Amino acid sequence: MLAPPEVAALPDRLTFKPLGIDTWQEHVIYMHPDCAICRAEGFTAQARVEVRIGLRSLIATLNLVGSGLLEMCEVSLSVSAVETLMARPGDIVTVSHAPALESLRAVRAKIYGAHLDTHQLASVVGDIAKERYADVHIAAFLSACAGGRMSVKETIDLTQAMVDSGECLEWDREIVADKHCVGGLPGNRTSPIVVAIAAAAGLLLPKTSSRAITSPAGTADTMETLTRVALSATELRRVVDRVGASLAWGGALSLSPADDVLIRVERALDVDSDAQLAASILSKKIAAGSTHVLIDVPVGPTAKVRSLQDLERLRMLLERVARSFGVRVTIVRTDGSQPVGRGIGPALEARDVLAVLQRSPAAPFDLRERSLLLAATLLEFCGAVEQGAGLEMATGVLDSGAAWRKFEEICEAQGGLRVPGEAIFRRDVVAEQDGIVTEIDNRHLARIAKLAGAPMRQVAGVEMHVRLHDQVKAGRPLFTIHAQASGELEYSVAYALMHPAVSIAPT
C-alpha cells in the first residue's frame, strides 16, 4: 500500500543540526513532529529512541520541536549526546525505537517493596551504566531503594554490580590506602590534606573522588580549581607510580561508571540513602584497588548523619559490605555540628586547603586539626606507625612542609598547580542583634551556597565569619555569599534572609 501523499513527499533522510542545548549529561534528541520518520514510526514526545550516527549509537529521550528551529529533515541533539556520538553538522542520523528494557521490571518490583536478587540488580545497574535509562527511570530506582528499603544482601549485590559495570585497578602493594567522607558537612575538605600527609609518610593512595551529590562541593570539584582531575586510568597509574598518590575525579575513569550516572540524578533529587551511599563509596574503592579505607562520618543535628543510632546503622552496613569484598574499613566519627573551615564551595574550600598545607598563620584551625586526626588514624590503621604515634607523625609531616611538597608533586603530576579564582559578586549577611551563636544550620548553608551557583560555578559559595559560641554584635557579618552572576547572588541572599542559617541568642 502506498503511503499518503503528504507523508511520501516528506524527506526521510535526517541530518544533524547543532543547537547547543545543554541537558546536563542526559541524552535528548530533538525532531520536528511532522518529519517522515516521526510519522512512520509513530514517535511521540518523551519516547525512548535509539540514535545512530555511523557506527556510534545511544539511547535518547525524544523532544518534539514544532517551531522553525528545525526543518522536517533535521534533528538536533543535547550537548552530551553530541559528545558521545561525536556528531558534526550535516551528519546523517538514523532514529528508531529503542529496545524494550527488561530490567525496568525489577525497578517496578522494587517500587512495590520486592527484594531484588543478584541478577535483577546486575541487570538494572548494567543498563544504567550503558545509559539506557532516562533520568526519570533512574530517579524511580533511587527512590525505590531509599528509606531503608534495601537489605544488606541487596546492598552487597548492588555494590558488586557497580564494580562489575567498569574496570578495576590492581597495585603491587600489600596495603593500598584510601580515605572518604560521607559528606553532608559544608567545608569539610580534609581529603587533599590527609592524602598529602599520608603519601608523604609513605602510604600508597590512588585517591579518586566524586563530585558533589547533596553538598556545594565534592573533593573532585575543589581539586579541579587547583589542578587537572579528569585523568584516564593510564594517566592515574602514571601519577601514582611517580608520586605515590593521586587526587583525581573518579567520573573520568571507568571505575564503577554506573555510580557517576546515579550521582547526577541523586544531586537533582537531593537524596543519598544509606544503601546507595555504601554501594557508591565501596564500589569506587574496590574498583580502585584499595585494601584499607578510612571513612569519616560527621554526626550532627543538621549533618547527613544526625544521631549515634544513625551512625551505628551506617557503620554496620559499611563494615558488612566491605568485609564481603575483603576490604578493611575503619569508621571515624567526627563533629558535624557546624561547617569545617571558612569556605563552602569549590574555590573557597581550595583556599582553605592551601592555607593549611602552606602552614599559613591564618589557616582554619579546625580544618587543620581534623585533617591531622584523620591522617593519624589512617597511618595507624595501615600500620605505617605504632598505635598512638600517628598524630605525632602526621603533625611532623605537615609542619615540616613535607605534606605541602607532596601536594605540589601530586598537582604537577596531574597537569600543574593553579590558583583558585574569585567571585565577582559578594554580599554579607549580618547579625540582626547582639548575642551568642547557638546554632549553625549546615543544610541551610549548603542550600545558600548552591543557590549562589556552587558547585557548577567554581567560585560561588559561602565564606563563614563566625563559629558556634562566638559573641557577635548587631551588624557584624556572619557570612559572605560569593557568586559569579548577580541573579544567583540575589536568589541566594533572598533565601538566606528567609531561612537564617546562624541562630543568635541574646546575652
UniProtKB/Swiss-Prot annotation:
It catalyses: thymidine + phosphate = 2-deoxy-alpha-D-ribose 1-phosphate + thymine. It holds the Pfam family PYNP_C. GO terms for biological process: pyrimidine nucleobase metabolic process; pyrimidine nucleoside metabolic process. Its EC number is 2.4.2.4. One of its GO terms (molecular function) is 1,4-alpha-oligoglucan phosphorylase activity. InterPro entries: Glycosyl_Trfase_fam3 (IPR000312), Glycosyl_Trfase_fam3_N_dom (IPR017459), Glycosyl_Trfase_fam3_N_dom_sf (IPR036320), Nuc_phospho_transferase (IPR035902), PYNP-like_C_sf (IPR036566), PYNP_C (IPR013102), Pyrmidine_PPase_CS (IPR017872), Thym_Pase_Put (IPR028579). The keyword Transferase applies. SUPFAM superfamilies: Nucleoside phosphorylase/phosphoribosyltransferase catalytic domain, Nucleoside phosphorylase/phosphoribosyltransferase N-terminal domain, Pyrimidine nucleoside phosphorylase C-terminal domain. Keywords: Glycosyltransferase, Transferase. Gene3D superfamilies: 1.20.970.50, Nucleoside phosphorylase/phosphoribosyltransferase catalytic domain (3.40.1030.10), Pyrimidine nucleoside phosphorylase-like, C-terminal domain (3.90.1170.30). GO terms for cellular component: cytosol. Belongs to the thymidine/pyrimidine-nucleoside phosphorylase family. Type 2 subfamily. This is Putative thymidine phosphorylase. It comes from Ralstonia nicotianae (strain ATCC BAA-1114 / GMI1000) (Ralstonia solanacearum).
